[in-house]
Amino acid sequence: MRWLVLLLLAFAMFCSYIFMDILSPIKDLMQSTRGWDSTAFGTMQGSETFLNVFVFFLIFAGIILDKMGVRFTAILSGAVMLVGATINWYAVTDAFQGSGLQTWFTNNLNYIPGFDELGISPFYRGMPASAKFAAIGFMIFGCGVEMAGITVSRGIVKWFKGREMALARLGVATCMIFSPVFAKLGGVIDVSRSVAFGVVLLLIALIMFIVYFFMDRKLDAQTGEAEEKDDPFKISDLGTILSSSGFWLVALLCVLYYSAIFPFQKYAVNMLQCNLVFNEVPSDSFWATNTVTVLQYCIMLVVAGASFASNFMKKAGMKYGLLTVAGVLLAVFCYMGYMRQSAETVFAVFPLLAVGITPILGNYVDHKGKAASMLMVGSMLLVLCHLTFAFVLPEFRDNAIGGIIVAYLTILVLGASFSLVPASLWPSVPKLVDAKIIGSAYALIFWVQNIGLWLFPLLIGKVLDKTNTQLVADLKNGVITPEEAAVSYDYTAPLVMLACLGIAALVLGFILKIVDKKKGLGLEEPNIKA
């Protein structure tokens, strides 16, 4: 039963992760078909967390979770995500272009009193109308997805207390593989098809939350317990949480690390397009067919499933057999990505190594501890990867095979570093606060994290435009086409900025380890109770 619950919650979050990055692999198409430059793209992407940060919606979400319970909040979050995604979809459709709504958005929301003075407005004068409307939808979606995040975290604590707490994510790979396919389906580019794909998945996610609602209620009926709700929220709860130095160190580690990962995902495909040369595959080639797309995705699922399952095999022969299958098919997956000559299929390898090692890391933290140490290792790998993208990968621009190999290896290591954080950070939160206010604790961590997830997509976009002034000028003057400009950015400065976040996270991890040892927070202790 508990694994079925994990499956329901994981699949719902899987769908939400897909929509979160649905436009990331088609940033170049958004610039060429909708006129979104890097600043507009980054501003729209950052809007996802705007209401969570500046209207404190995520704090309220934690209060709702504590007072109303997991079941109610899960369904509410699914509905909110679906509404926001639908608005986002309409904003990028052809129906929006030339409509009265487009005219209204063009003429309005160019100045937001207070927010403009503080430099935090989610809109600006000259921002494409479609980007403004999409930003509104993304804000609403962001409220839902972050509410879902803390709800799923709470649900896993309820069902898996003292057991494995890692949640595998393949949503990013699914998005990278299928989003461009839907956008280019039939040889006609229509970016709204990609978003529609995400909307359908969010409808499925809502259904998963509804099924979870009835399963969880059935569990309570069988055990004779009422749904677990926490004590009524009190302002003093926040004081209890905020007074913990360990909590603040974990929260800051979270914002630094995730700010160097999630915003990067939104630009990663375009970064590869700008640093490597991808030759267009002939339309009559086998590698250009949708059959290859589906086949590659199926191979990805087998790789993920085999590597994940190998962690639970007790017989050595079965364990290493599954690992061999996963390794061989991973090589096939990478070869197919190279033959397809598309940046999005190269970056799709991002979570595959993570899927295999996340159970290992989760099991290690559960039985051996060392969560703070694992956070430090993850930060070091993060710095190494971003510096490799910034300075090593561009040197292989004219080396087709060498560049792809460097890209694959770096992306796999980055994915592995990403798995270190969920496996070690989230299980540590219950050690820092009382179980009755854990919903508020998760909400506060997500709120701090959301500050970074709002700021850094916007910063990356602005830094790209500011450090590529000649490119921006040439595009404005018609010297180059939008299609050429979209794949010609120099990403060195943004990548160095992200590497600095990793360095700061490493320093904080070191401090956290010292504080843990001095105050006995138990972060280096096993999660499994003896």
Segments (PLM) and residue ranges:
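Cytoplasmic helix-loop-helix junction between adjacent transmembrane helices
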Residues: 131-174
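C-terminal transmembrane helical hairpin of 12-TM major facilitator-type secondary transporters
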Residues: 323-337, 342, 348-353, 371-425
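Helix-to-loop junctions at the C-terminal end of transmembrane segments
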Residues: 55-70, 306-315, 357-370
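Flexible cytoplasmic inter-helical loops of multi-pass small-molecule transporters
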Residues: 104-105, 213-237, 520-528
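Central cavity-lining transmembrane alpha-helices of secondary-active solute carriers
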Residues: 46-63, 301, 348-361
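Helix-loop-helix hairpin linking two adjacent transmembrane segments in secondary transporters
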Residues: 171-217
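Extracytoplasmic gate region of multi-pass secondary transporters
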Residues: 23-27, 244-310, 328-354, 358, ...
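C-terminal ends and interior cores of transmembrane alpha-helices
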Residues: 79-126, 332-336, 380-400
